[in-house]
């Protein structure tokens, strides 16, 4: 049980698949708070099935003692609350869906006494970039701190799950090994 002044953080990730970039985000967030809730998107609309993604995140964060992994269920970043994430709609629709999803998150955050929300910088996905912008705006009025963490980069630039999926598809396991934790590479 954490004290009343504890900093409690939250990260929501699809982790399709779990990369060194995801691990970096969790490390940065965990270092900044007393307790970090990591939510893995439950929607099974990804290359890597949810059960595997959740296992990879849990295994990839097992050494971080202040991290607790959860599934989002049908409540956060789901087809019910944020269909634009899966459909890639217009900016206006994305913004309204993001606001709805963030309102759901705020209810869960209140129940878990979350004080800080962490997201990775998003240079690649328009939908996620808009979501992060709306989230920063919405959280500013609630007293929740919003932290946008710069992406982990390697010699090829920012590490992205999209790039990792391409490496998997192309069978480029040498490059893949440099971008994912051992648990993901074994998968």
Regions from the language model: what does each represent?
Residues 1-187:
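Nucleotidyltransferase catalytic core that binds NTPs
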